[in-house]
């Protein structure tokens, strides 16, 4: 029931990325009790506790692992569903468009099943993008005004099958 910080992520997708290895070294020395993701997504410089990939289409094959670093998907998913009256704008954006709750649930289950199949191959973690819809992105499990898109019980059953 308590939030916690388990990893530091100084850079995401090269946004403001500079002096990468110096920054990662500083963070690892400053807080040796937590993992350091360096960086999440695009421009990896070979430092940090994990090699973080972003995946939005398919999950058939795990990227080549690196010795001494965990392989994770720091972002995956991107399944979009517009729910009338629960978005900031009439149109939103996502990688995979669905037209109904049923389509969203099917796409979500297929993607998580594929991700789960990569665990025995060495996938150490994956973070669904994203928990909630935001202004222009409708990829969330919850709408912009924090209503469920999918019944929590159905999501739990999918997760239990994989884990």
What are these regions, as identified by a protein language model?
Residues 1-159:
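Substrate-binding/catalytic cleft of secreted carbohydrate-active enzymes
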Residues 161-163:
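Surface beta-strand/loop "capping" patches
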């Amino acid at each position: 029931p308590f939030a916690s910080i388990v990893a530091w992520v100084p850079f995401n997708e090269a946004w403001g990325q500079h002096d990468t290895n110096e920054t990662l070294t500083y963070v690892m020395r400053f807080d040796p009790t937590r993992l350091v993701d360096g960086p999440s997504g695009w421009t990896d410089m070979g430092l940090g506790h994990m090699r973080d990939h972003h995946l939005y289409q398919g999950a058939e094959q795990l990227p080549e692992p690196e010795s001494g670093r965990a392989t994770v998907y720091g972002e995956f998913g991107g399944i979009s569903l517009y729910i009338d009256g629960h978005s900031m704008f009439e149109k939103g954006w996502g990688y995979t468009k669905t037209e109904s709750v049923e389509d969203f649930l099917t796409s979500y289950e297929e993607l998580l099943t594929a991700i789960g199949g990569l665990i025995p191959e060495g996938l150490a973690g994956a973070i669904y993008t994203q928990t909630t819809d935001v202004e222009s992105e409708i990829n969330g499990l919850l709408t912009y005004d924090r209503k469920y898109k999918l019944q929590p019980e159905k999501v739990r059953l999918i997760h239990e099958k994989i884990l």
